[in-house]
């Protein structure tokens, strides 16, 4: 079975695990080559990065990627790697990975598994599936982190519902978890967020969010 056939088999598996086979899976089953498959992935990206298919991709794609890499990269889709020059067209899927994955330029990264991701330049990172994901936002990077742990520095922007550390001219919108704010530009906290900061300057609390003194041990 070729790597492309393995991906189509994964589509069958995803269909069997959903009450009604999603249009995206049916479209993937009709594809005849990896170029067509990548076009369907882009059209139905939410299913690829957030649906049941994401779990199957996390398990099966890394083994098939070396063979499919050239064609996938031609479509602007990468797995556990990112080119230094990466326009907004570039999308990176990060699966379970035992090395740091650097995201550059304007690429958009979607974390599916347990991994460490460093975001640079104006890149974007989305982490909504793995509690063990670790994300570092540098430069002007943006992060949407509902699962995992994140540190934001420089002029990064962060939306988070997970535990986070801020240490720079960072803008943060927190909707849960614990936020340790060593340095920041603006912090808005809501839900049950617990904020640890040296002062309340430029911090807005809503809902049940609370603020506590930031001490050296933190």
Language-model regions: role of each:
Residues 1-218:
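Short, glycine-biased loop/turn motifs at secondary-structure junctions and
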């Amino acid at each position: 079975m070729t790597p492309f056939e393995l991906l189509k088999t994964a589509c069958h598996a995803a269909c069997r695990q959903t009450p009604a086979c999603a249009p995206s899976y049916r479209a993937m089953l009709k594809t005849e080559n990896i170029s067509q498959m990548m076009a369907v992935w882009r059209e139905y990206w939410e299913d690829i990065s957030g649906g049941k298919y994401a779990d199957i991709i996390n398990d099966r794609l890394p083994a098939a990627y070396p063979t499919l890499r050239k064609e996938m990269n031609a479509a602007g889709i990468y797995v556990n790697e990112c080119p230094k020059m990466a326009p907004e067209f570039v999308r990176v899927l990060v699966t379970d990975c035992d090395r740091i994955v650097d995201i550059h330029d304007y690429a958009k990264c979607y974390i599916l598994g347990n991994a460490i991701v460093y975001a640079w330049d104006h890149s974007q990172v989305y982490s909504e599936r793995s509690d063990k994901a670790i994300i570092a936002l540098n430069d002007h990077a943006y992060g949407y982190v509902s699962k995992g742990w994140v540190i934001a520095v420089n002029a990064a922007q962060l939306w988070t519902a997970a535990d986070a550390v801020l240490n720079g001219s960072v803008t943060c919108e927190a909707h849960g978890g614990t936020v340790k704010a060593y340095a920041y530009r603006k912090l808005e906290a809501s839900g049950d967020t617990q904020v640890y900061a040296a002062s309340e300057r430029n911090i807005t609390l809503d809902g049940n969010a609370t603020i506590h003194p930031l001490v050296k041990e933190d």
